[in-house]
């Protein structure tokens, strides 16, 4: 009986030498900031649809989204504490990401080059500019992805549409190109 117990103990010891530890990678924490989304659309349903794109891009990144409310609060506090008046720099975005304990930060904004004010022959404002979406690795401080969409002499709806376009293209790029985050 003791020989059997010793043999079993020996087998268990030998088997334990050949087992592999499996390391499970956790999903990266992703913060998403969409600057000017409320200004670029008047339709609440469109705004909600645009916000749903945030979760889709995080899903494409195989990440875990930091709640929008928490991200917005940290960004607002950062703006007030650091007296940011125009837009975030890369350093600002990285600092916000660190405050949120994020691995990546996704940032989109429409950058205005020119505004044509309403006048005698047209009654709506027209915009020229670029909607840019960037994904920044907070730890390495590097851009991992960047895409833009031009708006030339477009209305407010065109600015909103450009936001949808950059999100849709980004989601497709991440999935099709197999970008790793």
Where do the language-model regions lie?
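N-terminal secretory signal peptides that target proteins for export/translocation
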Residues: 1-3
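N-terminal segment of the mature soluble domain
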Residues: 27-34, 40-105, 142-145, 173-177
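Short low-complexity, flexible loop/linker segments enriched in glycine and/or proline
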Residues: 82-83, 121-123
């Amino acid at each position: 009986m003791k020989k059997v117990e010793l043999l079993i103990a020996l087998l268990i010891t030998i088997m334990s030498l050949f087992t592999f530890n499996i390391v499970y990678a956790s999903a990266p924490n992703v913060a998403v900031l969409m600057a000017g989304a409320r200004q670029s659309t008047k339709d609440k349903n469109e705004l909600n649809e645009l916000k749903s794109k945030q979760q889709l891009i995080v899903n494409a990144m195989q990440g875990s989204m930091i709640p929008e409310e928490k991200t917005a609060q940290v960004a607002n506090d950062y703006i007030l504490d650091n007296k940011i008046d125009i837009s975030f720099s890369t350093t600002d975005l990285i600092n916000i990401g660190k405050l949120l304990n994020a691995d990546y930060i996704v940032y989109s904004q429409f950058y205005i080059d020119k505004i044509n004010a309403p006048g005698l022959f047209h009654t709506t404002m027209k915009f020229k500019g670029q909607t840019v979406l960037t994904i920044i690795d907070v730890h390495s401080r590097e851009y991992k992805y960047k895409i833009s969409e031009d708006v030339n002499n477009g209305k407010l709806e065109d600015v909103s549409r450009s936001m949808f376009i950059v999100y849709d293209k980004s989601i497709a790029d991440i999935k099709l190109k197999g970008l790793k985050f």
